[in-house]
Amino acid sequence: MHSFDRRSKRLSWRILTYALKRMRTDPALDHSETPETLRARAGSTITEDGIGGTEALRIWTDVLAKACISVDHPRFFSYVPGAPTEAAGMFDVAVSAANVYGGSWQEGAGAVYAENEALDWVASLAGYPVTSGG
């Protein structure tokens, strides 16, 4: 693992600032890119010494994010993989920072409980019985 030093603290603030700005911005619809275009623009991102967090964030912001179709764009109706609200994004940050594994009750009872609550709510909206599952 790594230590949380001044450099890590600066990177954390840069990432959180990016996340807040992105969640508060009406996104461009953007478009996909070919692997060749991304290789030319992003370069080699996996290196023996690493590229560092600041450079990784720059590549994400300037190259990779722009090669993703923003699913919170008002004209995007194909998929809805997550809740496009600022609160949902911030809770994603909180859960990621906690670094929990929610794949089974033993390791992540709290996360699994929260997920089950959400699934039960969605099932009730669809009119499924309380015994539904799967």
Locate the predicted segments by residue:
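N-terminal entrance/gating region of PLP-dependent enzymes' catalytic architecture
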Residues: 1-131
